[in-house]
């Protein structure tokens, strides 16, 4: 995931 796109870590 990304720093601004991490719904579940």
UniProtKB/Swiss-Prot annotation:
<dbReference type="GO" id="GO:0005185">
    <property type="term" value="F:neurohypophyseal hormone activity"/>
</dbReference>
<keyword id="KW-1015">Disulfide bond</keyword>
<feature type="disulfide bond">
    <location>
        <begin position="1"/>
        <end position="6"/>
    </location>
</feature>
<dbReference type="InterPro" id="IPR022423">
    <property type="entry name" value="Neurohypophysial_hormone_CS"/>
</dbReference>
<protein>
    <recommendedName>
        <fullName>Vasotocin</fullName>
    </recommendedName>
</protein>
<feature type="modified residue" description="Glycine amide">
    <location>
        <position position="9"/>
    </location>
</feature>
<keyword id="KW-0964">Secreted</keyword>
<comment type="similarity">
    <text>Belongs to the vasopressin/oxytocin family.</text>
</comment>
<dbReference type="GO" id="GO:0005576">
    <property type="term" value="C:extracellular region"/>
</dbReference>
<dbReference type="Pfam" id="PF00220">
    <property type="entry name" value="Hormone_4"/>
</dbReference>
<keyword id="KW-0372">Hormone</keyword>
<comment type="function">
    <text>Antidiuretic hormone.</text>
</comment>
<keyword id="KW-0027">Amidation</keyword>
């Amino acid at each position: 995931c990304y720093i601004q796109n991490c719904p579940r870590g």
